[in-house]
Regions:
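Residue-level detector of buried hydrophobic side-chain packing
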Residues: 28, 56, 110-111, 166
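Alpha-helical segment that forms one wall of the substrate-binding/catalytic cleft
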Residues: 66-99, 104-122, 133
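Substrate-binding/active-site groove segments that recognize
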Residues: 45-71
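Active-site-proximal beta-strand/loop segments in catalytic clefts of secreted hydrolases
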Residues: 31-32, 58-59, 113-115
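Extracellular/periplasmic catalytic domains that process cell-envelope and extracellular macromolecules
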Residues: 19-20, 47-50, 102-106
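Long, amphipathic alpha-helical surface segments
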Residues: 2-16, 23-26, 30-43, 80-84, ...
Length: 190
């Protein structure tokens, strides 16, 4: 089992990385499994479908400050440390593109979404445009639906579940990450 992500965050960290919360970390970890376990707490690098970049753990492109090679391996502790660094970086990048105040649930959902699709896709997606323009709940659900319903080549059902969890978290007013609730999304919209 990988290390717990619940670390004490200072007030300075909360201000510096507003989207990086325990909730966002939990949301990503709940739906992302570290890939290519070698056993005994070691993990190997891998390539995602259609990519030329090597990754490790939760999708990190680097380990210990350098880009990965095909022969790289890492321990649980190294993967966890790099995952936290990646999320801090993503938090800063997401903060640059979101111009409206958001609840902690919404921040968590957006960080998970951006981490999954990549910052280049996130900054140009229509969903971000709707969020920044204070669009209605129905408009957001309608825009999130293709991300839920699309057949993901490398993610399959796990990716569909992750997108639903992100939407549920984004729409949830509570402090807990909600369990899945069905939305009126057409299954084969795209």
């Amino acid at each position: 089992m990988l290390l717990s992500h619940k670390k004490v965050r200072t007030r300075e960290d909360k201000l510096k990385y507003p989207f990086f919360t325990e909730k966002s970390t939990e949301l990503i970890k709940r739906s992302t499994v570290p890939r290519t376990s070698l056993g005994m707490g070691r993990y190997a690098s891998y390539k995602d479908y259609g990519e030329s970049i090597w990754r490790i753990g939760y999708g990190s492109k680097q380990i210990s400050g350098r880009y990965l090679l095909s022969t790289d391996k890492a321990t649980e502790e190294e993967i966890e440390k790099q995952f936290i660094e990646d999320l801090k970086e993503f938090s800063n990048l997401v903060k640059e593109y979101v111009f409206v105040p958001l609840s902690s649930n919404r921040k968590a959902a957006l960080l998970s979404f951006a981490h999954s699709i990549g910052i280049q896709s996130f900054k140009t997606c229509r969903l971000l445009e709707l969020i920044n323009s204070h669009s209605s709940k129905n408009a957001l659900i309608k825009e999130w639906s293709p991300y839920i319903n699309r057949i993901w080549q490398s993610g399959g059902d796990l990716m569909v579940t992750k997108r639903r969890m992100e939407l549920d978290t984004y729409l949830s007013p509570s402090k807990e990450i909600p369990t899945f609730t069905p939305h009126r999304c057409r299954r084969n919209a795209y």
